[in-house]
Amino acid sequence: MNKTLKKLSRRVALSIAVTACFSPLAQAAELLTEGVFKVGMEVTYPPFESYDSNNNIVCIDPEFAALIAEHLKAKPQLIDTKFTSLILGIGKKYDAVISGMYVTPERQKQADAIPYALSGASIIALKNSTIQPKTEDELCGVKVGLQAGTAWVSSLKTHSDEYCLKNGKPAISIQEFPTAPEASQALLSKNINAQLEIAPAAQIIVEKSRGRLAISSNRLVYPLPLGIYVAKGNTELAEAIKSTLATLKANGKYDAIIKKYNLESIN
């Protein structure tokens, strides 16, 4: 009887070991270089990522990156990269991109995305301006600034063509800037009339403007899921990240980050 139990125990132990070797986390960890989970992000985009007073990268995405790395039994390495170049560096400079980046069909042609939160844009205007757009319909004829490469560029162009022009209204004047802070500066300098920015970041921009800017929109504009991007076909890493997010939702750490930064959870 004891011999039978010992044999059964060995088989169970072997089965567990084999299963562990072929789990998404184990397979993904093997793909990482020297046990490092490299993540690309543009570190001028609070509250998604920014430098603190000690030059550490902090905020939403670094917190998610650290938790994913922990589950992969790896060390996180955050690589500051220009927003418009982020997708191009996946699989070359870093393993994934976590940078407040929406999931869009255009980006999904270049990389695979794992949704991790939901957000939308806010419209920012000069507080004392007569131009206070509440919705995208009120952007017709308005000079709107936003960061180049964001999902809203094509959305605004489509809205300008299919709503503004078709209804006899002037087109939306879309002004693209290399970074969100440059768009904000253009607004403060009155070179544009409004800025379109993701809601959590828009709130911080307004708070730092010393009362000069305000959020004029009365609801989220173009709400979309935010995604963690990995190289196309890297199913092991994608599944490992999905598994990690499921664990974080189960243990409450996911909800803690979502609530802390005023995002919406996604199933």
Regions found by a protein language model. Give the residues of each.
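Extracytoplasmic small-molecule ligand-binding "clamshell" domains
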Residues: A29-G100, E176, N251, K260
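Extended ligand-binding regions for polar small-molecule ligands
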Residues: E63-H71, S129, D137-A151, G227-S265
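Acidic, polar ligand-binding/catalytic clefts
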Residues: A66, E70, K75-E138, R219-L220
